[in-house]
Amino acid sequence: MSELLLELFSEEMPAFMQKNAEEGYLNIFTKIFEENEIFAKVQVFVGPRRITLHATHLPKITLPKEEEIKGPSIEAPEAAINGFCKAHNVSKLELPTKLISNQLYYFFVKKTEEREIKEILPEIIIEAINKYSWAKSMFWGDYKIKWIRPLRNILCIFDGEILPMQFGHLTANNITYGHRLTDNKKLEVTDFEDYRNKLLENHVILERAKREAIIKTGLLELANSHELIIKEDNRLVEEVVGLSEFPVVLLGKIPQKFLELPKEVLISSMRTHQKYFCLFDKTGNFTPYFLFVSNGRFTNAELVIQGNEKVLSARLSDALYFCKQDIAKTLESRLGQLEAATFHAKLGNLREKIERITDICNYIAPNNKDLITAARLCKSDLVSEMVGEFPDLQGIMGYYYAKHEGLNAEIAAAIRDHYKPQGLSDNLPSGNAALLALADKLDSLVGLMIAGETPTGSGDPYALRRQALGIIRIILENKLELNFNDLINFSINLYKDSSDENKNLIISFFKERAKFYFKNDYDIALINAVLDLNLVDTNFKLDALKEFLIEDAGKQLLNAYKRASNIIGDQKITGLVDASLFSTQPEKELFEVIQKISPQIIDSIADKDYKKALNLLSSLLTPITSFFDNVLVNDSDPKIAQNRLSLLQNICELFDKVAKFNRL
């Protein structure tokens, strides 16, 4: 069996694209091989500057094969038959026919002769290279090919020999290159083992998994050796894996003068901008140390550490300057600047947005002065120098500036946390922060949908699905008893260009997101039976109904309801139940139970005690079973029949006060 080695050597590829490229090229090569009936073992390795394919168990030749291609019916128009013949360069007389479903069809038998695999591999390779779609790609120089970064070399070896192929301006060879620390030393290789070994000798670890393991082990060992804690950060690990061909973990220190900065500023500078790992003491407190991954083992590691500390110091010096500039102004004084900051082209500026948020907060919690103050100031930090440089610190810098001004802790916390939750795993805000977060998200959701930014199957650029889920989680976690229909109406009316169509669209969207949220824990039929725009109420009902229907009594009662509902069908039942028309004991007993439990069920619903309401409904099981077993609803006397239908209607209406049982 034969072996193929391919390397696409380029300038540095973005780290966040490498893992997808590894999976993508593996799938593409595997699929194309299978389509050509080449069943090989395929591996793909991706690093900062190279994508490598290693395929083994390749046959020397491909077997001859025949493929039947179905053509038109023999009764098809002559033009269609001639077109099929022309496409396959044959005459009609040369085409065999086959009977399919009592109809004769022409067929063309495509024969493929056996070929040496090295003849078709260049075609396969070029097809695979072109088939992978990068999120972004580029042209360079005067060349016609397009790729993620400029390609500099193609190595392609089949069974120890260069496989003749060309991609754009590049002709395949047997050369690869070592790490930049080795001055990109040219390495001539013969096969995969030789290739991997020579790369390792020249400070390139081919396997992504090995680089990741080295980084994780190095981070943990170095942190432990200094009795420090490193928090798990798989996303950052994945990124630095894509930045280093030969990773070495080193320890640096933050200069003392920068420790007066908020820890979030330090963390953002290190993690987001420098790709450094923050360290904490055993009690979880932030420490002035960090770990970073060097791309290569340098003879003077201390010089590398000093260089990284110097780069970090430059960035933190800027942050310190920005912070001092910002605190010279109050959050209130920045409100005028928000008029120049656009929220959305169709929805005005951020000053207008905070006015709407303030109105919504006042609607939700009238006379809550701290909430209103937080609402007015919650976006002021967006026009600060710090947030301009570190956008991920929005809200956080507002919190520190509010504290610096002497505003109380409740206001500062609300400003900080009103962007939460930013995803399903994020913590939820509480207190005034929860109300402010709700108001902000609701205004964004309503406004952007009015502006025509409703999410589609192909995109949700403003993350409105996430915003809606955030609203739902805030309401449920904080048990906010809100009439969401009224709240949406209020929010919509804050916009001039609103309509009933907008309202219906927003409510429908919100209900769908609520269904999406609840279906993790409840059957969709249960959700449809109880969902309304009071989500706390909906949650109580779901819990009660789920527990109720697990029991046999609940299942039997549901069946009884369905039987009653089916008997009524589409009939419009009018009129009250007349007890004087009862002629059997079961219908008398059933009516007595209904009269007894009806006010109790209404009281239980008012108290939101849905378990009690369902238990009261359970007391109908015996009399309703007796009724169905012993009473003929469609009596020969129309008055009696109508009265019994009214009795069943009473039962269904009583059930429907708790939930829409017809949806179960």
From Swiss-Prot:
It is found in: Cytoplasm. Keywords: Aminoacyl-tRNA synthetase, ATP-binding, Cytoplasm, Ligase, Nucleotide-binding, Protein biosynthesis. One of its GO terms (biological process) is arginyl-tRNA aminoacylation. One of its GO terms (cellular component) is cytosol. It catalyses: tRNA(Gly) + glycine + ATP = glycyl-tRNA(Gly) + AMP + diphosphate. Its EC number is 6.1.1.14. Coiled coil: none annotated. One of its GO terms (molecular function) is glycine-tRNA ligase activity. InterPro entries: DALR_anticod-bd, Gly-tRNA-synth_bsu, Gly-tRNA-synth_heterodimer. The keyword Protein biosynthesis applies. Tetramer of two alpha and two beta subunits. PANTHER family: GLYCINE--TRNA LIGASE, CHLOROPLASTIC_MITOCHONDRIAL 2 (PTHR30075:SF2), GLYCYL-TRNA SYNTHETASE (PTHR30075). HAMAP family: Gly_tRNA_synth_beta (MF_00255). Belongs to the class-II aminoacyl-tRNA synthetase family. This is Glycine--tRNA ligase beta subunit. It comes from Rickettsia africae (strain ESF-5). The lineage of its organism: Bacteria, Pseudomonadati, Pseudomonadota, Alphaproteobacteria, Rickettsiales. The gene is glyS.
